[in-house]
Amino acid sequence: MKKFIETLTNIWKIEELRNRIILTLGILLVYRFGAHVVLPGIDSEQLTRLTDQTDGGGLLGILNAFTGGAFANASVFALGIMPYISASIVVQLMGIAIPYLQKLQKEGESGRKRINQITRWLTIAICIVQAPAYLYGLGALGVPDSAFLLGKGLNFIIPSVLILVTGTIFAMWLGEKITDKGIGNGISLLIMVGIIAVLPQSFIQEFVSRVSENNGGLMLILIEVILWFVVILASIMLVMATRQIPVQYARRTATGGFEKNVFGSRQYIPLKLNASGVMPIIFAQAIMFVPAAVAGLSQSDTAKSIQAAFGDIFGLWYNLVFALLIIVFTYFYTAITVPTNKMADDLKRSGGFIAGIRPGKETGDYLDKIMSLITFPGSLFLALIAILPAIVVKIVGIQQGWALFYGGTSLLIMVGVAIDTMQQVNSYLLNRHYDGLMKTGKNRK
């Protein structure tokens, strides 16, 4: 505990890091406050039915968790950051097929800014479609007509659509500000803080269910909590696991007027088992909202079957498709975020090489092969943890709301984002000659 307090003191001593953390916390507070600001013209006291449906888990429960309860509150942030996530998925997928986007991806910082601008405009377009669907869907989700104080006419719909679109744009801006001026990935942090906000209520519901209904009592609650920490530990191991590729560097020495190369020190290239982080989970989850939403627009028997299959997040078909999407997106996102050819070129320029592998293209091919080999078990493990809530609901019979945190999207996002943020703080400490946050807080001599 003493070392931990000393580490916090060292964090506070670094002015830039301190300011970034304060800014990040301030922005997160603003986002959480906005999640409780109800849309004008809606009586918040009559949203009980909507709250009950989202508290019960299911697809609405996940959506509500991603928005930090804003969906159930009919707040100005009801759409959350998901339209931005959807836009990012579309832009990255289009980058495979559209030469213009491929060109932008290779232009460095200027290309990245242009891609971000395209993503923002696409986010607005998605919001314009989703906002009216959300407003008209409130009635179908159990919100009575009396809750709409201004009625459901255009005098309510048009201003509310503008507010919802503005809310998502503002949330997107908050996330980008955290990324640029704060600490951590802003968009991921907004999702994480929303998930954490609904965690206590889900646990309380599980606790009350076990105790009041004589359904296992405190002993079963204790076992569930212990197993929950085991799953968290497994998730941390997945996020942190790496394969070390040994690299040697040649150095020149002069002997009798002649220069010769000798082997220098051995170093390693760390290739992460899960190099794509939590993005495959977020992307896959965003896509899983689509089938049920589209099927809900039709009253045909086929559409109803699709809606039933993909509306049950603990069902067989939902989890099979979800796991498959996670595996696909893990490979896809790893290919984007791990430029093995660039790593090989950088290694060649610095005089490094992998024993038995020619520098340059062969090294790039070798690194790509290794990444493909380690990504497969990593993606399977990621998919297994993602569908774990469905498994524990079927076997253990825990509350669906609590099950969402028993592995699955929610837990993986919390663990992944927390570790990523801690690593950024860690780098600041190491750069200022302090031991990292992962170890101690002692000043280095």
Give the positions of each predicted feature.
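N-terminal cationic and glycine-rich segments that engage phosphates or anionic surfaces
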Residues: M1-Q105, S110-K445
